[in-house]
């Protein structure tokens, strides 16, 4: 009888290669359909403040930047630009995401992109014992220490979200 092999993503393999402890999690989704982050948190039974979405932007200088913020938050483009020393930044179009990062919309992770871009985490990540980020594929998340994650991607922390209304 064949053993059932647990599916691993490139993100999980990268974490193992670097010796970074993590816990894998899966959640239900439609075929090729990316649920919003709050739904992911609900499906995993965790506080949405622990689940971070990965957003990729392009600065006025032409440089690319990655921002990881809580799933219920909205990126403040002015604060984000200031955090990376740009005059302005804009969200990357979905069609540009896969060729640039190797990830699809809804499965983008700060870990294991084709090229490592400057990465900024919302400062609230540091208040959590663990955070969840995409494991590089829709339906998969990894839970790990924010300090380990920031060290791995050489990330910084700043207030880059819009004020809650």
Q: Model regions: which residues?
A:
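Extended, low-hydrophobicity, polar/charged segments
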Residues: 1-165
């Amino acid at each position: 009888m064949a053993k059932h092999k647990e599916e691993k993503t490139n993100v999980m393999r990268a974490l193992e290669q670097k010796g970074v402890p993590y816990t894998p999690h899966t959640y239900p989704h439609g075929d090729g359909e990316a649920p919003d982050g709050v739904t992911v948190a609900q499906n995993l039974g965790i506080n949405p403040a622990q689940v971070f979405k990965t957003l990729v932007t392009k600065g006025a200088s032409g440089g690319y930047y990655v921002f990881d913020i809580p799933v219920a938050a909205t990126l403040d483009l002015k604060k984000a630009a200031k955090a990376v020393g740009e005059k302005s930044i804009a969200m990357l179009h979905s069609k540009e995401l896969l060729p640039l990062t190797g990830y699809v919309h809804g499965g983008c992770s700060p870990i294991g992109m084709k090229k490592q871009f400057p990465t900024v985490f919302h400062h609230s990540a540091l208040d959590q014992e663990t955070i969840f980020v995409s494991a590089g594929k829709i339906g998969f998340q990894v839970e790990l220490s924010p300090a380990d994650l920031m060290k791995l991607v050489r990330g910084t922390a700043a207030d880059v979200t819009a004020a809650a209304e």
